[in-house]
Curated annotation (Swiss-Prot):
Pfam families: AEP_C962R, D5_N, PriCT_2. PROSITE patterns: SF3_HELICASE_1. SUPFAM superfamilies: P-loop containing nucleoside triphosphate hydrolases. Residues 473-502 are annotated as: Disordered. It comes from Frog virus 3 (isolate Goorha). It comes from the Viruses. This is Putative helicase 022R. Keywords: ATP-binding, Hydrolase, Nucleotide-binding. NCBIfam families: primase_Cterm. GO terms for molecular function: ATP binding; hydrolase activity, acting on acid anhydrides. InterPro entries: AEP_C962R, Helicase_put_C_phage/plasmid, Helicase_SF3_DNA-vir, P-loop_NTPase, Phage/plasmid_primase_P4_C, PriCT_2, Viral_Helicase-Primase_Cplx.
Length: 973
């Protein structure tokens, strides 16, 4: 019966093709390598794929190839022939070629592909001999990267990918080879499972690689791939693999994102090729480096995460956030494999709330690449089940030959503290220790050094255990005699608590004596300075993470309070994690004085685009896309929540209760005008979120006792080390020369959120270039004192800039881009102490609270909650905010007072319908006027710059100049 089914399948496949034959002038979709042209369309497509799948399952040969259409997935054919070596192409070479192609695609395709679109499938055949040598070619296919066939042929494979792949080949093998076929995306492509008539082997899937070149399950990589209904539903894994690996775009390409090639210059391709070669060399070096631990192997990593997860207690499984964090961590560490899911499910079953269907849905649909590391599991195990973790650590085997050495002791320290300490930096090593919330700098590793000799510490306990094991082996007489009784004793005595027993039995008594002596010396030595220093030096190599100093405090959406981390992505306060990489924390607790609305954040609201339906024309699909864009615009203005769910932003004390009411009463006295108060608090609401997206600097101005200093002190008390006071020279002085130390600018790194310049002198003017660079969100370099040039670090500004002054300072060489960043906040209140009177022009007068400084400490926690609350409300606003007139009027008055060109026009030009102001006359008059009147106008301005600035005020000039204007004061009537 089975044979009859196979026979029917064979006849069915070629019967389908026979009914789809086409002539030479018709468009073909498939062709037979033994002869025949076919056009398989309509309902025949589903029948064709079912027949192909049946032939693959039965092992019958197929000689059908697919013809290229207008669009094609990226396919790379490497024709490798080696005269001498019959070994297959190394996996490290293929993986690095794939990683290089992924880098190229990410930088050269528009729009940039996502990581999930860069999965590649490696197809191979067995190595076979031919007349020229050993054939061991391979294919790499990218089903989700769909390009125009002409673009792939003329701009991608030959000009870009061929030199990159050649460089990688040379880096791994030492010989540059151009094995990539330039016609890889042009010639017909064999259907999966098909082979040429003269070859017995078909191309088979060897492995699937993710964007980084790591092996991933095929269904995990392409589980989101959908095929047209006319193709039918796959009935087996082989059936689905053949459909996914089809290059046929008819009725299918619309289900994939298309990428238009952005031509890169040859220099860019060369740099990318060189970089890929360096990465390949490092990968080869890592694989060749001998290591006595097997942490890098997948099996060992799976065992480690399985053991660590088993130590987690049931209360952690009950906490949903921790339960999800463990799931994301396991998904990342196991690449979303089925084994990882089993580990997570086993942990989930510790809770009575476990729902296997929910676990399966989350694992397959919601899990995604993340920053969780094995350190998350280690930290949870150490914190919630320290005894089990130490017992597990004791069972971990140290090679017998390394017992008692400094390297072995350092490895023990790394096994236990590897996720709590980090060493980074160059010649001057910098150590960090994770204290459960943030990473705290440890002076020269002093904290780790003290743990080396700690009583009851892991190192001392494991050394004692190793000494007991070696002493026991020595007591048995050293090397085994080979007697059956000895073997029986060995089997009886050896257990998991002594992983070295079998190896120690094979050693001579002299070697055991040496090991005993070495272990006893180490137990004494760990209390001596020299041994501790040597172990710490070995630890520096194991704990070293060179990039740690560059990424610490770099996440703008994480902020550390004294009692936890507020995650603005998730909108919640949570425990600290090692992978947060935060080193600063505010001195105040985050107190939940009330509920905080869910913020509509870009990370939480992905936009879904409708797919093109089978049979739908391109024009109809384009119209539906236009409707989708209109709906997105409406939803963006209306928010993602219903009208009744959106909480409006309020700064009225009557809308709140308790300490928040006192806080807003304070701001109501400082800013009696509600518009100004709302503007100030809106800007302050983004304090905890890094960056300056609005690119503004606030100038706090007002004379007398008006609350500027008290307000600044309140924010300083709340932010602590996140707030920095700058010297006025930072903005008013000259830019430091290249390479010189600039400690003031260096202080602005490390996640600082609040930068203030107070009270510049009357003769100081702000440098417009420095002001724009500090508010433009562009990174800058700054060298601290006593730092070498190589250690100069790049600072990504996370702060908002504030200038506090009684009189607004001048801005040197300010253009319109400078004034667009300036906002003046008038402090109009006057606080009068007993026995004094307010000035005659005071607009708002309040009695001064002489005890306000002490009371500020009780306002810091309400301020922290209120700013987060305001930020969430602002994210959900539907109407674009417009600054109040009072702020804009003060800003325009400031601009008018310090805008040289407007002053020049008002003082030196007059309207005259019979005159025309020439460029030469205007430039001469402006030069003379600035020399006589401007305190900072001594810098000679080019004529073209003066003309351009005057055009912004007087309008576009004609060939002769500006008609209707003349030099001279306006005549009085």
């Amino acid at each position: 019966m089975a044979n009859a089914t196979i026979k029917y399948t064979t006849m069915d496949l070629y019967g389908i093709l026979k009914s789809c034959k086409c002539s030479s002038d018709e468009r073909l979709t498939h062709q037979s390598l033994s002869g025949g042209r076919f056009s398989v369309t309509g309902s025949k497509v589903g029948e064709f794929w079912r027949a192909v799948a049946d032939r693959i399952e039965s092992g019958e040969p197929i000689d059908i190839s697919e013809a290229r259409q207008k669009e094609t997935p990226l396919t790379l054919d490497f024709d490798v022939v080696d005269k001498d070596c019959k070994e297959p192409v190394p996996d490290v070479l293929v993986n690095n070629i794939h990683a290089a192609v992924a880098r190229w695609a990410r930088s050269s395709l528009k729009p940039a592909p996502e990581d999930r679109d860069l999965c590649g499938v490696v197809l191979t055949k067995p190595v076979r001999q031919c007349a020229k040598g050993w054939k061991k070619g391979f294919h790499i296919q990218y089903p989700k990267l769909v390009l125009e066939t002409g673009v792939a042929k003329n701009l991608v494979v030959g000009p870009a990918l061929r030199p990159i792949c050649s460089k990688v080949w040379e880096a791994v093998t030492g010989t540059a080879k151009d094995y990539l076929d330039p016609l890889s995306c042009t010639v017909p492509w064999l259907v999966y499972g098909a082979s040429k008539p003269d070859e017995p082997f078909a191309w088979k899937i060897a492995r699937t690689l993710d964007h980084a070149g790591k092996t991933i399950d095929f269904n995990t990589a392409f589980g989101d791939v959908e095929t047209p209904p006319s193709w039918g539903r796959p009935t087996s894994d082989r059936h689905r693999e053949a459909m996914v690996l089809s290059i046929h775009p008819a009725g299918r390409s619309v289900f994939f994102r298309r990428y238009d090639f952005t031509a890169a210059n040859p220099g860019r391709v060369t740099r990318l090729a060189d970089y890929s070669a360096v990465m390949a060399k490092l990968d080869v070096a890592r694989q060749r480096k001998p290591a006595w631990n097997t942490d890098a192997t997948k099996a060992h990593r799976l065992k480690r995460v399985t053991d660590l997860t088993a130590m987690l207690t049931a209360d952690l499984a009950d906490d949903r956030q921790t339960w999800l964090n463990v799931g994301f961590c396991l998904w990342q560490q196991t690449s979303g494999s089925a084994e990882g899911y089993k580990v997570w499910l086993s942990f989930s079953k510790k809770s009575d709330k476990c729902d296997e269907d929910e676990c399966w849905t989350i694992w397959n649909n919601q899990m995604r690449p993340n920053s969780f590391t094995e350190g998350t599991l280690v930290y949870l195990a150490q914190k919630h089940n320290p005894g089990a973790y130490l017992n597990w650590l004791q069972v971990k085997s140290t090679p017998v030959n390394d017992i008692g050495t400094n390297v072995a002791m350092a490895k023990i320290m790394w096994d236990y503290y590897g996720h709590q300490f980090v060493c980074c930096g160059g010649k001057t090593q910098t150590w960090y220790r994770f204290d459960g919330l943030t990473w705290v700098e440890s002076n020269q590793g002093t904290d780790l050094r003290s743990l080396i000799s700690a009583e009851g510490g892991p190192l001392r306990r494991l050394l004692m255990r190793q000494l007991d094991a070696v002493t026991a082996a020595k007591a048995r007489g050293g090397r085994d005699s080979g007697n059956e009784d000895d073997e029986e004793d060995s089997a009886t005595d050896e257990d998991d608590s002594n992983p070295w027993d079998s190896e120690l039995r094979r050693l001579d008594s002299e070697v055991l004596d040496t090991m005993v002596k070495r272990l006893r010396n180490n137990l004494k030595g760990i209390e001596m300075t020299g041994v501790k220093n040597n172990v710490l030096r070995e630890c520096a190599e194991l704990f070293y993470q060179p990039e740690f100093g560059d990424v610490i405090d770099s996440d703008p959406l994480l902020f550390a309070f004294a009692n936890g981390i507020y995650d603005f992505r998730e909108g919640c306060l949570r425990d600290g994690r090692p992978e947060d990489k935060l080193s600063r924390r505010a001195p105040v607790d985050f107190v939940m004085f009330g509920p905080i609305p869910k913020a509509r954040h870009p990370d939480n609201s992905p936009v879904m685009r409708p797919k093109r339906m089978p049979g739908e024309s391109v024009q109809d699909h384009a119209r539906r896309l236009a409707e989708c864009f209109e709906q997105d615009d409406v939803s963006a203005s209306a928010g993602t929540m219903g009208k009744e769910d959106v909480e409006s932003f309020s700064c009225n004390p009557n809308d709140f209760k308790g300490p928040v009411t006192k806080l807003l009463a304070f701001f109501a006295s400082v800013f009696p005008d509600e518009g100004t108060r709302r503007f100030f608090l809106r800007n302050a609401a983004a304090t905890f979120v890094g960056g300056n997206p609005d690119k503004v600097v606030l100038f706090w101005t007002g004379t007398g006792n008006n609350g500027k200093t008290v307000t600044q002190t309140l924010f300083e008390k709340m932010l602590g080390c996140f707030a920095v006071k700058m010297s006025t020279q930072t903005l008013t002085g000259r830019k430091p020369s290249a390479g010189s130390a600039n400690p003031e600018m260096a202080r602005l790194g490390g996640g600082v959120r609040w930068a203030v310049m107070e009270e510049p002198n009357s003769d100081e003017t702000i440098n417009a270039g420095t002001l724009k660079s500090m508010t433009g969100n562009d990174s800058f370099f700054a060298r601290d004192l006593y730092c070498a040039g190589k250690t100069t670090f790049e600072i990504k500004p996370m702060f908002k800039l504030h200038v506090i002054c009684n009189a607004l300072p001048g801005i040197k060489d300010a253009d319109q881009a400078t004034w667009n960043r300036v906002r003046v906040v008038p402090f109009e209140s006057t606080f009068v102490t007993p026995g004094t009177t307010a000035p005659a022009d005071a607009k708002y007068v309040f009695p001064a609270d002489t005890d306000i400084t002490r009371k500020l400490d009780r306002l810091t926690a309400p301020l922290a909650w209120y700013l987060v609350y305001c930020w969430a409300c602002i994210q959900n606003e539907r109407v674009k905010y417009v600054p109040p007139p009072k702020v804009m009027e003060a800003t325009m008055a400031y601009q008018k007072e310090h805008d040289l060109f407007r002053q020049f026009v008002e003082e030196m030009l007059r309207k005259d319908p019979d005159s025309t102001l020439t460029c030469d006359d205007a430039y001469t008059a402006f030069r003379d006027w600035t020399s006589a009147n401007s305190p900072h106008g001594t810098v000679r301005r080019p004529k073209g710059q003066v003309v351009k600035c005057l055009e912004a005020i007087l309008g576009k000039k004609t060939v002769d100049g500006w008609p209707g204007y003349a030099v001279g004061a306006e005549q009085q009537e």
